[in-house]
């Protein structure tokens, strides 16, 4: 017999697909619940989720970013990617375009500053004719400014940037 929905009434096909999708959804949901039950969660993680002061998190991130914007020295070695902080943004990183990212990242590392280079060019990505994209891939670097850091940390980063 030919297994095709071409000769079945559309309502029957839709019902069948809907039933299959529903069954898959609930199978996946039950599997996730089993995984959660097996691994559970520790009380500290539950407390963090239930009681964490997210307003303080947002405030600290914004203060750190604002500090970097106000105190980061101008340099030919890098350009600030997002030079304005609007009211809705809660950044986790201070992102720059570095003229020589490798040298810049190594310098930061030598001074105890972790910086991240995101988005490596994948093997199937062709940047030919996309010079703006290629520039971003080759130059973007991010320095964390999240709630773990203080104004003193941001001041240290700015001093290190000044000496680059």
Predicted segments with their positions:
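PLP-dependent aminotransferase class I/II
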Residues: 2-164
């Amino acid at each position: 017999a030919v297994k095709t929905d071409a000769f079945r009434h559309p309502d029957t096909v839709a019902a069948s697909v809907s039933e299959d999708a529903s069954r898959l959804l609930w199978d996946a949901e039950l599997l996730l619940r089993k995984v959660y039950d097996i691994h559970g969660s520790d009380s500290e993680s539950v407390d963090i989720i239930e009681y964490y002061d997210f307003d303080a998190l947002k405030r600290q991130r914004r203060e750190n970013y604002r500090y970097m914007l106000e105190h980061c020295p101008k340099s030919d070695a890098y350009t600030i990617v997002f030079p304005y902080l609007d009211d809705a943004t809660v950044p986790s990183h201070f992102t720059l375009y570095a003229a020589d990212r490798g040298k810049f990242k190594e310098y930061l590392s030598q001074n105890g500053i972790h910086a991240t280079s995101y988005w490596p060019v994948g093997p199937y990505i062709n940047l030919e004719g996309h010079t703006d994209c290629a520039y971003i891939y080759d130059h973007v670097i991010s320095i964390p400014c999240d709630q773990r850091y203080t104004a003193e940390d941001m001041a240290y980063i700015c001093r290190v940037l000044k000496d680059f």
